[in-house]
Amino acid sequence: MINISFPDGSVRQFENDITAYEVANAISMSLAKAAMVAEINGELKDLSTVIENDCKLRILTAKDSECLEIIRHDAAHIIAEAAKELFPDIQVTIGPAIENGFFYDFAKDKPFTPDDVAMIEARMHEIVKRNEQITRELWNRDKAIEFFKSIGEHYKAEIIASIPAGEQITLYRQGNFIDLCRGPHAPSTGFVKHFKLMKVAGAYWRGDSRNEMLQRIYGTAWATKEQLDNYLLMLEEAEKRDHRKLGKELDLFHFQEEAQGMVFWHDKGWSIYNTIEQYIRKKIRKNGYTEVKTPVLVDKSLWEASGHWEKFRDDMFALDTDDKTLALKPMNCPCHVQIFKQGIKSYRDLPLRMSEFGLCHRNEASGALHGLMRVRSLVQDDAHIFCTEEQITDETVSFCKLLTEVYKDFGFTNISVKFSDRPEVRAGSNGTWDKAENALKEAVEKAGFTYTLNPGEGAFYGPKLEFVLTDAIGRQWQCGTLQMDFVLPERLDASYIAASGEKKRPVMLHRAILGSLERFIGILIEEYAGCFPLWLAPIQVAIATITSDLNDYALEVQKALIDNGVRTDINISPDKINYKIREFYNQKIPMIAVIGKQEQENKQVTIRRLRTTEQEVLSLEQLITLIKEENEKYL
């Protein structure tokens, strides 16, 4: 007798071995028809899986979030089948589910054209209509290698050859197509109804630039038409907000081939950058941080001692000089430990909060670079808190409060937290990890956050919190982090004198709020769609004259504004006023001060605000006071 327990607490008994599908059918025919996969003792399995022993069982349908990845994985198999039917000479390689969709890499002599992609998408819909049964097959490894070689699929044969000898191979068959896969999959292709192919890109075989270039087709797939439509609308809006496009239109920054992954900041973009730095500097000073500056180029011996050389060597820029190897720092933490070690530290000196706008360099692959979001040269709003174990909770709560204030000032109120606990490969004892994880959990709960668990995703030296923002169009951005570190102080021999008189290692909290300033500015450009709030806008007020005989007064207004720290632009050309206003609106300047004869006579300006048709007449003093008060809230 087999006892099967269900999520509602009920238990059913079955006399003989039974498949998950048969269990679903025993509950109701409608459930069996909608069922996609089964969760057996916490693991996702095909519905054809035979249940031989007592277990816990969930039958999952498209309404369950876990099935979205199944739908996308099925879609990857369907695109491969469609492409093979239309282009029999191509080879299929790999095709996983990814965030928001799927992709498949193909080896094809000629590039896929837009017409080819449209044909593949149409054939995918045909395969879905066929509702082909998807079946799991176990194969002998050597037999599988020979089979794929015999049908000209040499990439698949190579993948299987890398699997240890003697292991069974899992293949999935649908119609005349068969693919290597661990699964699970839905019972048939008919479950994948709502998808769209998005683009074609190049991808190296096995992600290695020394290998041949393949063609990758990306797609998106969703459980419902409404979800698909909403996603496509979001992409359309995201395209309008693309920071690379707006960065060019608003004259903020540019990139060029001679300095890949390095930002050329223009005057307006650099204004935003400096304003953010000024804002953060004010915040951290109020919260008891000191600010330091450490070298950019450091001997590799420090990176070897810290463990970064072994772990991140391939991502570091290094050069040999005077029989030494120097490396551009990829992060600031080892340098901050060097400052901590200067002079004897007492428990009375802790917590010590050390911040730096640290210039770091990371050797990102050229294909991974993406505007401001992924660069090789970056500045982090980095800080390290050296504290005792007893201070961990209070310091974490204090950091969470500061982070919440900062995000709110930039307009982000929807913040979620991911808690990443111990990875399989880690430094430190289980007891140390228990203590660290419990302290972080207590602190994040005390700070008023709920969190989702990211099992095994902590750093090798300690658990971490990741703070995720949701933007105006529903996208999520991981920005802030707090990582606990018991290892680096040990490796770099940092210590303090405890109240007992003995030497102890401080705990090191690595923390950032914005992450890299470059990436955060990219996020802000897209969040605001280029319409920055008054305090942050590179040009706060633009002055436009109706006629040229008002130019002297306009210049007087500009000087008064500049003298009071207001960022301004002016157009006193003979162009028509409507043209001037339109040009300033296109530059998304928050306030336009229009000057006519009446304004000159009364020492006033007429203010037009971005995104509104309302006008407001202010004296010059009122305008200056209004902007200064807004600036002082943040700066």
Curated annotation (Swiss-Prot):
Subunit structure, interactors included: Homodimer.
NCBIfam families: thrS
Cofactor annotation: Zn(2+)
Record-level GO BP terms: threonyl-tRNA aminoacylation
Its EC number(s): 6.1.1.3
Catalytic activity from the UniProt record: tRNA(Thr) + L-threonine + ATP = L-threonyl-tRNA(Thr) + AMP + diphosphate + H(+)
The entry's keywords: Aminoacyl-tRNA synthetase, ATP-binding, Cytoplasm, Ligase, Metal-binding, Nucleotide-binding, Protein biosynthesis, RNA-binding, tRNA-binding, Zinc
Protein name (record): Threonine--tRNA ligase
Subcellular location(s) per record: Cytoplasm
Cofactor annotation remark: Binds 1 zinc ion per subunit.
GO molecular function annotations of the record: ATP binding; metal ion binding; threonine-tRNA ligase activity; tRNA binding
Residues engaged in binding Zn(2+): 333, 384, 510
Annotated family: Belongs to the class-II aminoacyl-tRNA synthetase family.
Highest taxon of source: Bacteria
Annotated Gene Ontology cellular component terms: cytoplasm
HAMAP family: Thr_tRNA_synth
Enzyme class: ligase
Span of domain TGS: 1-61
Matching SUPFAM superfamilies: Class II aaRS ABD-related (SSF52954), Class II aaRS and biotin synthetases (SSF55681), TGS-like (SSF81271), ThrRS/AlaRS common domain (SSF55186)
Pfam families in alphabetical order: HGTP_anticodon, TGS, tRNA-synt_2b, tRNA_SAD
Organism: Rickettsia akari (strain Hartford)
PANTHER family (UniProt xref): THREONINE--TRNA LIGASE, CHLOROPLASTIC_MITOCHONDRIAL 2, THREONINE-TRNA LIGASE
Function: Catalyzes the attachment of threonine to tRNA(Thr) in a two-step reaction: L-threonine is first activated by ATP to form Thr-AMP and then transferred to the acceptor end of tRNA(Thr). Also edits incorrectly charged L-seryl-tRNA(Thr).
Annotated region described as Catalytic, given as residue ranges: 242-533
